Design a protein with these regions (language model features):
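N-terminal leader segment of winged-helix/HTH proteins
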Residues: 1-35, 81
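N-terminal helix-turn-helix DNA-binding core of bacterial DNA-binding proteins
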Residues: 23-67, 87, 91-98
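Short hinge/loop at the helix->beta-strand junction immediately C-terminal to the helix-turn-helix recognition helix
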Residues: 52, 80-81
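Alpha-helical residues within the helix-turn-helix
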Residues: 60, 77-78
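Short, hydrophobic-biased segments on the C-terminal half of alpha helices
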Residues: 73-74
C-alpha cells in the first residue's frame, strides 16, 4: 500500500495521542542520518572547537580529499546542522548550535 504525502501516524505516549506526519518523519530521518556518521561527527567536533572554518581548513585538518569534505559538509548543510557565510571568495562553515540543541533534545526524548 503506497502512502500519501499527507498521511499521518498516531503514536501514544503517556496516555497522549501524538500525530506524526510522514513527510515530517522523513525529514527527521534525514537529519538524524546526517549526524549519525563518524566523519560528519568529526566535522561537527572540529567546527565546535574552531567556530568557523573553510572547506580547505577542514579537509587539511582531517586529512581528507577536498571532494569528500565538501560532500559531507553539503549533507550537514541540507540537514540544517551547519551554516555558511561567504566572505569574499571563501565560504565559512559554522555550527547551528540551536539546531544541534533541538536534535539533542529530540534524541533524548526518543531514547528516554
Amino acid at each position: 500500500m503506497k502512502k500519501q504525502k499527507n498521511e499521518t501516524v498516531t503514536l501514544k505516549k503517556g496516555g497522549q495521542d501524538i500525530q506524526l506526519d510522514y513527510s515530517d518523519l522523513r525529514k527527521a530521518v534525514l537529519v538524524l542520518r546526517a549526524v549519525n556518521h563518524k566523519l560528519r561527527q568529526r566535522i561537527i567536533d572540529l567546527l565546535e572547537e574552531n567556530d568557523s572554518m573553510t572547506v580547505t581548513d577542514i579537509y587539511i585538518k582531517l586529512r581528507l580529499e577536498q571532494s569528500v569534505a565538501s560532500q559531507h559538509l553539503a549533507i550537514l548543510r541540507r540537514a540544517g546542522v551547519v551554516l555558511t557565510e561567504r566572505q569574499g571568495k571563501f565560504i565559512y562553515y559554522s555550527l547551528d548550535k540551536e539546531r544541534l540543541a533541538q536534535i539533542s533534545r529530540l534524541v533524548e526524548e526518543l531514547a528516554g
